């Protein structure tokens, strides 16, 4: 069965009308690109070497849709409306990384209603997979919006080796910055990241974005993926609490998270008990929906099986331990 390259809707060749509108301003774009990775303007993310995947992630910038195609080059003055990522060549299951990020972003958005950047799965001219996302730091008039990541907001310092001192910053520290509404959203994102095996949600993977009213709110999610498919990653990127529950353990021991830890973080954020209970119920019964979407994804059969194992393992740990 064919699925939409954007939302994975059944019986769709290419993109459904809804994804054409959200991603390409109603243009009928071919998911088979006419260019290759080598043809694109690109940068290597300037993350410290200590990052598991982001430290070597390369992003390309492509322009507006022209007819039925995306443009691989930007003329002077043009804006890079889309970001494109190739496969991760240096990790396990490299060809699955674009489909991994794509399906993880879709699960966050469709199953849990988490705000995410609009994204899709595509293929380069040579057939290799690509992940494409529409930038959210431009408004409808293509005017640049202010965006600042939490490495900057929390003023994370680098040590002499160039690595961020992650032990000095925790997810609890985000509560000093986030609005009450954003704190609820943030808890839901953290639970989702744990369940999907995202051990790479560092300070730079969260941002505040300027709204139409000029204030700064938590941006849509980006860079969501199951990092366990590609590296032997930690369960979460940062400690939940300022007590440093993860990194304070003796070497070789691992902190076993349960849903009560996330509830405790919610309590410290002063989120109402009834709302926290509602969040727990929402996630408790969603594993089957996640498995169905993984089954429809563009992942290889091997990657699908490993992703399903991640979901089963983390659901057991979070809700049954």
Feature map (PLM): residue ranges:
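Anionic ligand-binding catalytic core segments
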Residues: 1-203, 207-321
């Amino acid at each position: 069965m064919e699925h939409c390259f954007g939302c994975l809707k059944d019986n769709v060749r290419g993109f459904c009308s809804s994804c054409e509108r959200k991603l390409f301003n109603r243009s009928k774009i071919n998911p088979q690109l006419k260019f290759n990775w080598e043809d694109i303007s690109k940068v290597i993310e300037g993350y410290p070497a200590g990052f598991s995947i982001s430290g070597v992630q390369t992003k390309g910038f492509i322009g507006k849709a022209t007819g039925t195609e995306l443009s691989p080059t930007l003329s002077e003055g043009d804006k890079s409306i889309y970001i494109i990522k190739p496969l991760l060549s240096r990790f396990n299951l490299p060809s699955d990384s674009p489909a991994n990020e794509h399906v993880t972003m879709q699960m966050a958005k469709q199953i849990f209603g988490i705000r995410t950047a609009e994204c899709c799965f595509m293929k380069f001219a040579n057939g290799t997979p690509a992940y494409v996302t529409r930038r959210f730091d431009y408004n409808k008039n293509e005017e640049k919006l202010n965006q600042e990541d939490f490495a900057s907001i929390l003023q994370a310092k680098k040590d002499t080796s160039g690595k961020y001192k992650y032990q000095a910053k925790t997810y609890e520290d985000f509560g000093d910055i986030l609005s009450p509404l954003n704190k609820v959203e943030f808890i839901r994102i953290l639970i989702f990241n744990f369940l999907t095996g995202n051990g790479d949600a560092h300070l730079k993977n969260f941002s505040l974005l300027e709204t139409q009213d000029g204030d700064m709110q938590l941006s849509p999610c980006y860079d969501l993926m199951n990092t366990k498919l590609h590296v032997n990653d930690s369960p979460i990127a940062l400690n939940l609490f300022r007590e440093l529950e993860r990194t304070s353990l003796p070497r070789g021991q691992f902190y076993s998270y349960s849903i009560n830890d996330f509830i405790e973080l919610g309590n410290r954020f002063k989120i109402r008990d009834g709302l926290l209970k509602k969040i727990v119920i929402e996630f408790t019964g969603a594993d089957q929906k996640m498995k169905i979407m993984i089954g429809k994804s563009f992942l290889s059969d091997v990657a699908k099986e490993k992703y399903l194992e991640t979901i089963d393992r983390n659901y057991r740990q979070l809700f049954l331990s």
